[in-house]
Regions:
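Short, flexible helix-loop junctions that flank or precede catalytic/ligand sites
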Residues: 1-251
């Protein structure tokens, strides 16, 4: 805002104002968050991402926080995303409809190969479901390799790669190396463009299981977006085994 610094919280999907403070405090406020989030406090012209860990003294839990800094006409806008850092939520506790969960196991996760797309708007729990599915598939006789931007949950026993464009560790440079790691299951944090979509298709065609997320409103939208990326329809039909679209319901 032009004259004030507004603090808002999103609870159960509803964004509301918590407090409005004097704009004079904005610089000190943002600099402190930048320091905690390991961002560059001198950089005010470009968008940045950061990461911090906060200890909740009342419960003794560590809370993982992703920091997003966005440059606006009135200064820097900061969004903090809280991540659950405790043990992963088992799939049967995510509260899917029983029939949906049963089909997700039988028609997707238990198949030997193919692409599994988890879709939905931002903030609908796609990442939580993705990690729960990966944790379900994780076993001593399977090689699971990931490319994520960034790694949000650590799962013991799998090879997780956190991408970093600053050192040229991108999807483009990482995906060829994944195929040399003898993976049974490949996890891509998100399909963002035609390159990552084609990489997922090629991996599935060679007998791998691929799990990833996609920003679309529904299941049909996921397939249409793949087609808009100029992926041939017969390639989509022969590799995509499941599309799971989800929403979060308010308590």
């Amino acid at each position: 805002m032009k004259n004030d610094l507004r603090i808002r919280f999103r609870c159960d999907g509803v964004l509301g104002v918590y407090k409005t403070i004097d704009k004079k405090l904005a610089s000190a406020f943002t600099n402190r968050i930048k320091i905690l989030g390991r961002a560059d406090i001198a950089e005010r012209r470009h968008h940045q991402d950061g990461h911090m860990t906060f200890e909740d003294t009342s419960t003794g839990r560590n809370i993982d926080i992703r920091v997003s800094i966005y440059i606006t006409v009135y200064g820097e806008k900061i969004v903090l995303r809280l991540l659950r850092k405790t043990q992963l939520v088992p799939l049967d506790q995510i509260n899917m409809f029983p029939r949906t969960l049963s089909r997700f196991y039988e028609d997707a996760l238990d198949l030997p190969s193919g692409i599994i797309l988890i879709t939905g708007p931002t903030g609908t729990g796609k990442t939580t479901t993705l990690y729960s599915a990966v944790n379900y598939l994780n076993s001593i006789d399977r090689c699971v390799t990931t490319a994520e931007d960034p790694v949000e949950f650590i799962i013991e026993g799998i090879a997780q790669c956190s991408l970093n464009s600053k050192i040229d560790l991108t999807f483009e440079t990482t995906l060829p190396y994944i195929m040399r790691q003898d993976p049974d299951i490949i996890v891509l944090g998100e399909i963002r463009d035609r390159f990552s979509a084609e990489a997922a298709i090629q991996a599935a065609l060679t007998g791998h299981k691929v799990l990833t997320t996609f920003h679309t409103e529904d299941t049909t939208g996921a397939l249409l977006r793949l087609m808009n990326m100029n992926i041939e329809t017969f390639m989509i039909a022969s590799t995509v085994v499941a599309v799971l679209a989800q929403r979060l319901l308010r308590r």
